[in-house]
Structures are given as structure tokens and as C-alpha cells.
Amino acid sequence: MLPMVTGFMNYGQQTVRAARYIGQSFMITLSHANRLPVTIQYPYEKLITSERFRGRIHFEFDKCIACEVCVRVCPIDLPVVNWRLETDIRKKRLLNYSIDFGICIFCGNCVEYCPTNCLSMTEEYELSTYDRHELNYNQIALGRLPISVIGDYTIRTIMNSTQIKIATGKPLDSKTITNY
């Protein structure tokens, strides 16, 4: 008789413990139900990137001295630099510069170590294409500045979304500074 009673007591304790665990997880689920949605409706709303965001690389042809430091510090030897030595002035003349963004890992080493600051990272992150050969940007394509997300009036940015309007009570423009 005694083993049967202890068995029922263990069963009761296990049932209470299981109910407590289920109740705790249910309370966590309910606490998350009150939060505002985090999802961004991508084609219509774009996330404003931070100033340290590592997007597409911008290249200024006139500043480049063809030193090839960017190629040496790149972990995958990605930038292709074609140059010719001008014998009359005894300097390198840059002929072609290209980066294949299908291979680039966006580490930023080329930008960091460039002695003339001819490379910089932009906020552009929309590089998708149907043909991988279109991701090979030459000096002309690298020299184009991207359209700023804040300055693009066709896109409703996250700063003007309903989430911010609810939190602050008024819509924000692109010049408003917020502390998150």
C-alpha cells in the first residue's frame, strides 16, 4: 500500500511541476503579445542604415594612385586593378578598376587601408540581380552615388511608419533626431 501512495504523490508533484512550466511559458508568450511589430514591409518601407553600415563600395577614379593596397589587404584578392607605368612622369596610370560584388564579403578592409580615401562604403544594400555577371562593377559603375534612402520621396521610410507615430504621437521627418 505504501508504494502506491508514494507513486500517487510523485505523480501529483510531477503534474504540478508540468503545469507550472506550461504556465510560465504561456506567461512569456502573453508578455510578447503586447509588443509592436518589428517587421518592415520591405518594398514600401526601407530601413535607414547606420552611418557605419557596410554597403556597396563607392570608388573615386581621380583619387586612386594604383598602389594596389586594396588588393593586398583583401582576404580574397578581389579588386582588379589594371595600370600602366608612365615613363615620362614615372608614375602609375590607372586604366581599369573593378570589384565583383558576387564574391565580395563587404569586410571593409579596402576602404580602411586606402591611403588616398578613394574608396568608401555606401548605404546601398540592394544589389540583387538575375545575372551574376551584372554584379561585376567597373570604375564607372562604382563611381555612381546611390540614391539616399532618406532623400527618396517614393519610399515611405521606417521613420514615417505608423509604429513611430503611435510611440511619439506625431510623424517624424527625415531631419528629426531620435535616440533608440
From Swiss-Prot:
Residues 55-84, 95-124 form the 4Fe-4S ferredoxin-type domain. Binds 2 [4Fe-4S] clusters per subunit. One of its GO terms (molecular function) is iron ion binding. The keyword Plastid applies. GO terms for cellular component: chloroplast thylakoid membrane. GO terms for biological process: photosynthesis, light reaction. Gene3D superfamilies: 3.30.70.3270. Its EC number is 7.1.1.-. It is a peripheral membrane protein. The keyword Iron applies. It is an enzyme of class 7 (translocase). Its cofactor is [4Fe-4S] cluster. Keywords: 4Fe-4S, Chloroplast, Iron, Iron-sulfur, Membrane, Metal-binding, NAD, NADP, Plastid, Plastoquinone, Quinone, Repeat, Thylakoid, Translocase. [4Fe-4S] cluster 2 binds at C74, C104, C107, C110. InterPro entries: 4Fe4S_Fe-S-bd (IPR017896), 4Fe4S_Fe_S_CS (IPR017900), NADH_quinone_OxRdtase_chainI (IPR010226), NDHI (IPR004497). It is found in: Plastid, Chloroplast thylakoid membrane. It catalyses: a plastoquinone + NADH + (n+1) H(+)(in) = a plastoquinol + NAD(+) + n H(+)(out); a plastoquinone + NADPH + (n+1) H(+)(in) = a plastoquinol + NADP(+) + n H(+)(out). [4Fe-4S] cluster 1 binds at C64, C67, C70, C114. NDH is composed of at least 16 different subunits, 5 of which are encoded in the nucleus. NDH shuttles electrons from NAD(P)H:plastoquinone, via FMN and iron-sulfur (Fe-S) centers, to quinones in the photosynthetic chain and possibly in a chloroplast respiratory chain. The immediate electron acceptor for the enzyme in this species is believed to be plastoquinone. Couples the redox reaction to proton translocation, and thus conserves the redox energy in a proton gradient. Belongs to the complex I 23 kDa subunit family. This is NAD(P)H-quinone oxidoreductase subunit I, chloroplastic. The gene is ndhI.
